[in-house]
A protein has these predicted regions:
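N-terminal helix-rich structural modules
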Residues: 1-65
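Active-site metal-coordination segments of metallo-dependent hydrolases
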Residues: 214-226, 286, 345-351
Length: 365
């Protein structure tokens, strides 16, 4: 069938091509090593959560070391004439996107962004006192459910719960699951997390139902998927027009905290640019730098030029170089993201790609 795919319709031909590659790649990975790796990543998540919550990188280090070792082996097992080294991992998440393409993309961003970030964030006003008040989690949950519904998430075909790190998952267009996390001293975090994840979810729910249970389902690519979440989060969610419609509801939910805060003050706050330690809470201007940091680190981990034991120190060094501030803890530094606990090396660059696509979509509208 693979040899005759040119005679098939586009959807079936694509399905056959993807299936053929996955089967071929799977056969290249030793079964025993893959089974051990599956057990390792299953255990690594709970260890990662504990390490993050206790600021204890040493607890997670042996697990991450083994995960990186396996990913390095993957780049050897799965190498072909089109991809080798880190390119093998990049291709898993955004097919045909290589280091060469990402390097051109990030080099252009780095040249223009780093000096702008330094200049803009040097003048930023301090966080207003109202933004650090106590916003009870149950009330945040109520408002985030309101936003989820406003943005047309179909509750008959999905659900929203809580997790340590917000994410979207599911099993086709009729079973889409999103999670959120609530910090009682940071109302913006949960708001923009739920808008972001609802962007993923509504894209997923609107995919062609005929592609359910196929390898073509779930969206065109991770970069395109991320463009939808970033479009919702930044283009829609940070606009004054959006909050003209919904700020009154937020004030009703938190009258004590927000009654004296004007719409313009709130919109200015959620659009402020500052050097933040946490990627998921970064503004549009500084967000790409967070991704570039991870992109550079992943390459060094995979090519062996950076040892896992040296990761926290290297993270802080590069973070200081890009942002001019140093993470005070590993929880706010190298331990902030769950991706590496799952072995998702090569995933982070799709976030920056998605942001660029979202901006291009908006510019074309």
């Amino acid at each position: 069938l693979y040899e005759h795919r040119a005679e098939l319709d586009d959807v079936l031909a694509h399905e056959i091509e993807v299936m053929h590659k996955r089967i071929a790649d799977t056969k290249k990975i030793p079964a025993k090593e893959y089974a051990e790796y599956s057990r390792l990543t299953a255990e690594a998540y709970s260890v990662y959560v504990k390490a993050k919550n206790t600021n204890d990188f040493a607890l997670f280090e042996p697990y991450l070391t083994k995960i990186v070792d396996f990913c390095r082996k993957q780049t050897v097992w799965l190498a072909d004439e089109h991809a080798h080294g880190y390119d093998v991992l990049l291709d898993m998440y955004e097919p045909h996107y290589t280091r060469e393409k990402y390097d051109r993309f990030f080099d252009a961003l780095r040249t223009r962004l780093v000096p702008v970030v330094r200049r803009v964030t040097a003048k930023i006003a301090p966080v207003p006192a109202w933004a650090t008040q106590n916003f009870p989690a149950d009330k945040q949950r109520d408002f985030c459910e309101y936003l989820r519904d406003v943005m047309c998430f179909d509750k008959t075909r999905g659900i929203m719960k809580e997790s340590e790190h917000p994410f979207t998952s599911g099993f086709g267009t009729d079973d889409v699951r999103i999670t959120n996390h609530y910090y009682e001293d940071n109302i913006a975090s949960s708001i923009f997390s739920v808008i972001h994840e609802t962007g993923h979810a509504t894209y997923e729910q609107q995919c062609d139902r005929s592609l359910n249970c196929t390898l073509s389902g779930g969206g065109a690519s991770l970069g395109m998927h991320e463009s939808q979440s970033r479009f919702y989060e930044n283009v829609i969610g940070r606009s004054k027009a959006f909050w003209q419609a919904h700020y009154g509801k937020l004030q009703q939910t938190f009258p004590q905290q927000l009654d004296d805060v004007t719409l313009d003050e709130f919109v200015a706050y959620v659009n402020r640019s500052e050097r933040s330690f946490v990627r998921t809470e970064a503004d549009e201007l500084t967000y790409p730098l967070h991704i570039m940091l991870r992109y550079e680190i992943e390459q060094k981990l995979i090519d062996g030029s950076l040892a896992v034991k040296d990761l926290p120190a290297y993270w802080n060094e590069k973070f200081t170089e890009y942002f001019g501030i140093t993470p005070p803890t590993d929880t706010l530094g190298v331990l902030q993201d769950v991706h590496w606990a799952y072995g998702n090396f090569g995933y982070f660059p799709t976030y920056a790609l998605g942001s660029a696509i979202a901006s291009q979509l908006f510019a074309a509208m």
